[in-house]
Every structure is written in C-alpha cells, then in structure tokens.
Amino acid sequence: MKTPRLPIAIQQAVMRRLRENLAQANLKLNRHYPEPKLVYTQRGTSAGTAWLESYEIRLNPVLLMENVDAFIAEVVPHELAHLLVWKHFGRKAPHGKEWKWMMESVLGVPARRTHQFELQSVRRNTFPYHCQCQQHQLTVRRHNRVVRGEAVYRCVHCGEPLVAG
C-alpha cells in the first residue's frame, strides 16, 4: 500500500499538539526537554512508536488520515510520554507506572495502552487456521513462524494447537 500524502494542515496540527504537550510537561517537570523528531513512517497496525535513542516519534500516516482528531489527541501524547519517561526516569517498563503518571498527571490524557482505530485499511493478508472450537486468522509473520517450525500457537479458549486450513 502506498503511503498517503499528509496535508500540511494535519502535519501542523500534529506538531502543534506535540509542542503544547511538551511545553506542558517541561513546565510541570521544571525541565527543558528538547522537541523530538517527528516522522510519518510507521506502518502496519501500530499507530505510532517512540524510538528512545534517536529521540524520534514515528506515526502511521494511514491511521492518522483516517482518524485525525482522535489520533492527534491520543497517539501524539502517548508516544511523547514514552520519550519523556525515558528522559526523566531512564529505561522503564513501556506502559508502567511512570508512563501512566506521565500521561495522566503531567500531560492530562487518559493512559490507554492501545488505540481503537479501525484497521481494515492497514491490515495485511491473514492465513486461516482452526482449532477444535473455532476459526482463527494468523498474520503473515505468525504463519511464517509456524511454517518454519519456530512457533506453535494455541487457542486461548480451548488450548488446542492451531492447525492451518
């Protein structure tokens, strides 16, 4: 799938939210953390990722275009919080108590670990598998691990190994 061109107005809205959240955090934490690099290269079903060492936030342009307001309100502060926790506390659990505190007490945003965006447009091909009780769809990555003998996946309901087909 070709990455969509993001309108400049959306990029500006993302940057505005990032700068507002960063200024708020710097004020509350009495720090001067720098602005992270912002890129629109995230792919797949992840809305965004925070890269600690490069101090960079990668956002999914497809999910952003499809969910502009919710994406800017939730994903931008979520990823910024990861970077701020790393700067403020060092390496901690990705969604641990420090991250939750940063989201809720510092940025004033509900601390949700996952987004609820519709994923139909970014979902890759899946492969049919089954167990004794139901059908399953495995991603390409999981399917390839099964084929190579690197993994066995089990049904969360009946506990039986999943079988292709």
Curated annotation (Swiss-Prot):
One family name in Pfam for this protein: SprT-like
Annotated GO biological processes are: response to stress
Q: Name any cofactors this protein relies on.
A: Zn(2+)
* Keyword entries, A-Z: Cytoplasm, Metal-binding, Zinc
Positions annotated to bind Zn(2+): 78, 82
* UniProt-annotated catalytic positions: 79
Localization per Swiss-Prot or TrEMBL: Cytoplasm
- GO cellular-component term (any): cytoplasm
Free-text remark on how the cofactor is bound = Binds 1 zinc ion.
Gene Ontology molecular function: zinc ion binding
Q: Which NCBIfam families match?
A: PRK04860.1
Q: Which family does it belong to?
A: Belongs to the SprT family.
Report the protein name in the record: Protein SprT
As recorded in Swiss-Prot or TrEMBL, the protein's gene is named sprT
